[in-house]
Amino acid sequence: MRSHISVMGKKEGMIHIFDKDGSLVACSVIRVEPNVVTQIKTKESDGYFSLQIGAEEMNAPAHTITKRVSKPKLGHLRKAGGRVFRFLKEVRGSEEALNGVSLGDAFGLEVFEDVSSVDVRGISKGKGFQGVMKKFGFRGGPGSHGSGFHRHAGSIGMRSTPGRCFPGSKRPSHMGAENVTVKNLEVIKVDLEKKVLLVKGAIPGARGSIVIVKHSSRT
């Protein structure tokens, strides 16, 4: 049941590729190195079933690793074989999906060999503090004829009743840098030799960011 286990990968960018019908499609490139199981949580020990997986092993000298990684984290990873990883993620799973998985097991793109679509989760690009026109698509005001109301939100209140502005209205605020999941992306190619997964369309995050890929919840 490893096809239902999530794995971490790194977004390499986007390319164009011809599909089997000869159409040119835009694809996101995800590099998936082997993910290693560093912890197994069960119903008896933690109240639910999940795996903690590690990716991108740190190959720095021991004295450098001790400076960059906390002692509790080093002690935790020592129980799983002593390998230190730059990224750790916990992925939920059912008892059936985690059956036969043990500490130190490694898996990568082979879990997607017979999969037609996947869900990809990542952190979207941060845009900083933005106004309502960029963030929410507001129309704004007139651009000329003496108007000073160009990129404002407009009225957000009422009269003396209720005498206040309701919370939750669309206002200028921070944009991006949020967890985003894109579902049901078609798998174009699984290249086990190059450790690359090609999916149709865009995925969240900047080039080089970490994404989590799992079997699509819609299939």
Swiss-Prot record:
SUPFAM superfamilies: Translation proteins. HAMAP family: Ribosomal_uL3_B. Keywords: Ribonucleoprotein, Ribosomal protein, RNA-binding, rRNA-binding. Part of the 50S ribosomal subunit. Forms a cluster with proteins L14 and L19. One of the primary rRNA binding proteins, it binds directly near the 3'-end of the 23S rRNA, where it nucleates assembly of the 50S subunit. It comes from Chlamydia pneumoniae (Chlamydophila pneumoniae). GO terms for cellular component: cytosolic large ribosomal subunit. It comes from the Bacteria. GO terms for biological process: translation. This is Large ribosomal subunit protein uL3. Belongs to the universal ribosomal protein uL3 family. It holds the Pfam family Ribosomal_L3. InterPro entries: Ribosomal_uL3 (IPR000597), Ribosomal_uL3_bac/org-type (IPR019927), Transl_B-barrel_sf (IPR009000).
